[in-house]
Amino acid sequence: MPKGERLFMASLDQIIDDFVFLDDWEDRYRYVIELGKALPELAEEKRTPENKVMGCASQVWLVTHTSGDPENPIMSFEGDSDAHIVRGLVAIVLATYSGKPASEIAALDAFEIFSKIGLVENLSSQRSNGLRSMVKRIREEAKVRAAA
């Protein structure tokens, strides 16, 4: 991955602010779709079984990159999905976790943030389970890397 490449278009703080600003869920869903459209497309060669997230109804791929201290590396992520809303959820997950040390990622439960903005409560059970699978995969990977 080239240095300085942006992995997502909006920061988590910006996403939270936008969610608070938007009044109804129809507008919020459109916003999630827009976040997905802004997400760089994952290269075809990275859409491998190893990068596929299990537990998602849609196809979702996550690729992890690390840099810095091998004992507590900074982790960044690329991701993609074949479904519009899920692609937006991938963008939110990447905004939440990318660019942080592995130990911080392992300790950060994104579902507290997602609940605060009402995201989890307004997703179908399939999408909510997929979101949980993405978060679980990232946090488990971070725990392994932080313990290395």
Curated annotation (Swiss-Prot):
SUPFAM superfamilies: SufE/NifU
Pfam families documented for this protein: SufE
InterPro entries in the record: Fe-S_metab-assoc_dom
Family matches, as PANTHER family: SUFE-LIKE PROTEIN 2, CHLOROPLASTIC, SULFUR ACCEPTOR PROTEIN CSDE
Protein family: Belongs to the SufE family.
Protein name, as recorded: Uncharacterized SufE-like protein RHE_CH01250
